[in-house]
Amino acid sequence: MGTNKPVVIGIAGGSGSGKTSVTKAIFDHFKGHSILILEQDYYYKDQSHLPMEERLKTNYDHPLAFDNDLLIEHLQQLLAYKQVEKPVYDYTLHTRSDEIIPVEPKDVIILEGILILEDPRLCELMDIKLFVDTDADLRILRRMQRDIKERGRTMDSVIDQYVNVVRPMHNQFIEPSKKFADIIIPEGGQNHVAIDIMVTKIATILEQKVNL
């Protein structure tokens, strides 16, 4: 554990853009080092007080769906090298589960999520801000595959949600947040050159912090 505050790398981009692939590529490169991943997806607001018919109306692509206050609190605690208890979201019940995941502080924190660059409070806590930029057609195919396989959705429901929610929210909130990125990575996890550049940059920042 270092004596300076951890390095925070923010990785944003639309749903299905390849954020997870970029995150994994960076994480794998530094495997064996002190590094963790903190996903914004875990910080959807608790909705246990709402009836199921209300929960089903949740717009998961709107900034107000996230409990960024808790995410910021946890990120600040990790920056102070304190353990946090990450919530777990149940997409079948559309609310938080009773489960929590203990997260130990590390020297490198990868913060991943569709709207992490939309909140200036989160941006202020990041050392590097990335935006993964991928063609819309590819993003919808990836989202369809994920939601059907991992979240028990039907193809019709995924397409309906994309047309009526995901695409308009992407255009209204996610795409505009791209201007806050330090680096834009086209083609997601397939862009090995951009990932190699990022790995080198992160290594340089870590070295500078150690030598402070």
From Swiss-Prot:
EC number: 2.7.1.48
Matching Gene3D superfamilies: P-loop containing nucleotide triphosphate hydrolases
GO biological process: CTP salvage; UMP salvage
Enzyme class label: transferase
Lineage top rank: taxon: Bacteria
Main location: cytoplasm
Keywords: ATP-binding, Cytoplasm, Kinase, Nucleotide-binding, Transferase
Catalysed reaction equations from the record: uridine + ATP = UMP + ADP + H(+); cytidine + ATP = CMP + ADP + H(+)
GO molecular function (one): cytidine kinase activity
Pathway: Pyrimidine metabolism; CTP biosynthesis via salvage pathway; CTP from cytidine: step 1/3; Pyrimidine metabolism; UMP biosynthesis via salvage pathway; UMP from uridine: step 1/1
Residues bound to ATP: 13-20
Gene Ontology, cellular component aspect: cytoplasm
InterPro entries (alphabetical): P-loop_NTPase (IPR027417), PRK/URK (IPR006083), Uridine_kinase (IPR026008), Uridine_kinase-like (IPR000764)
Location(s) in or outside the cell: Cytoplasm
Family to which this protein belongs: Belongs to the uridine kinase family.
Protein name (database record): Uridine kinase
Naturally occurring in which organism (per UniProt): Bacillus cereus (strain AH187)
Phylogenetic lineage: Bacteria, Bacillati, Bacillota, Bacilli, Bacillales
Gene (name only): udk
